[in-house]
């Protein structure tokens, strides 16, 4: 099972702990889409990155964490094919999968603690879709989505911002480069900036 996880600055710490938890499960492959510090970022950028990867079929599920769990769900729901669910208890996490076939779980770090978050995540990813009458209802949602021209992946006009991390700088050094080229709208984490300055690596936006 492949899972994409991401958070804004409000969900950064809980996201890291959930990432570590999932990384230790043998049947799970998890990828971290940022953010990588507590510096303020815009939750739609992270939500779009994770949701697009899930919609493309590159990941089975997405997990998004912000302060309350509402904004990221709103953003994720704008990506065609994404059925996000804000779940701040175990009951809703089970129902989101069994009844609604949700493929992106959203949580609020200001609402749930680590132990509850682990339970929510585990129930979400382990609960199969019930199908039957539930499938009929979900199909109505998807049909309405198609008819009303929601944002499609291939037509996504604003590319999500790249987040430059220390690992990106290290990769450049290992490949003999003293320069890292990034998009003009990219986010540079403080650790990446400090590391680049220390190693005399230039970061050029273009």
Regions found by a protein language model. Give the residues of each.
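C-terminal binding/interaction regions
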Residues: 2-14, 91-153
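A short beta-strand-loop structural module common to alpha/beta enzyme folds
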Residues: 29-40
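Structural motif
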Residues: 39-48
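Short, high-confidence coil segments that cap the C-terminus of an alpha-helix
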Residues: 59-60, 101, 177
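Short hydrophobic/aromatic-enriched beta-strand-loop microsegments
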Residues: 82-89, 200-206
